[in-house]
């Protein structure tokens, strides 16, 4: 009878089977894991929910105290609110951007990004999404689109002025 000497390490698998540890950027920022992407969508949509809420507070200030300067409104450019008093064009921008941010950058990412990325694959028992890189790009493009929309306040012509009918 022959005896086989086993190595002291785990004999089930090759040495090359282990992956190198992922960096913070690979694991949490540019991740293809559906759970991490769902959490990213959660934080970004909560940020845009805060932005939309701040826009709503400005709308309500104008409705409650028309023609009065808003507290802290001095930080707004003169093209939007000279002396903290809202111009009519800026008010329409607020209404348009509030609705756009709340519908397209807060509510939809919460439903589609968080629910579809985080919960549904776990409930189905799937290990990952079908196309994880496309899933990652969908998050980054949604974030980029929201930041570009937010930057619309800082261009010379201002943000879109379509009113509430644009998203209704």
Segments predicted by a language model, with ranges:
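...captures the hydrophobic TM-helix bundle architecture rather than a specific catalytic motif
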Residues: 1-168
């Amino acid at each position: 009878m022959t005896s086989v000497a086993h190595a002291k390490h785990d004999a089930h698998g090759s040495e090359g089977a282990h992956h190198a540890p992922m960096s913070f950027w690979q694991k949490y920022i540019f991740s293809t894991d559906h759970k991490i992407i769902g959490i990213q969508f959660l934080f970004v949509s909560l940020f845009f929910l805060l932005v939309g809420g701040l826009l709503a507070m400005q709308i309500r200030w104008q409705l409650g105290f028309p023609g009065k300067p808003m507290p802290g409104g001095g930080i707004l450019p003169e093209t939007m609110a000279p002396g903290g008093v809202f111009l009519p064009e800026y008010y329409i921008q607020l209404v348009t951007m509030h609705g756009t941010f709340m519908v397209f950058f807060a509510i939809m990412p919460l439903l589609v990004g968080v629910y579809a990325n985080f919960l549904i694959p776990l409930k189905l028992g799937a290990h990952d999404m079908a196309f994880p890189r496309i899933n990652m790009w969908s998050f980054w493009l949604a974030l980029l689109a929201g930041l570009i929309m937010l930057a619309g306040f800082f261009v010379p012509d201002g943000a879109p002025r379509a009113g509430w009918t644009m998203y209704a």
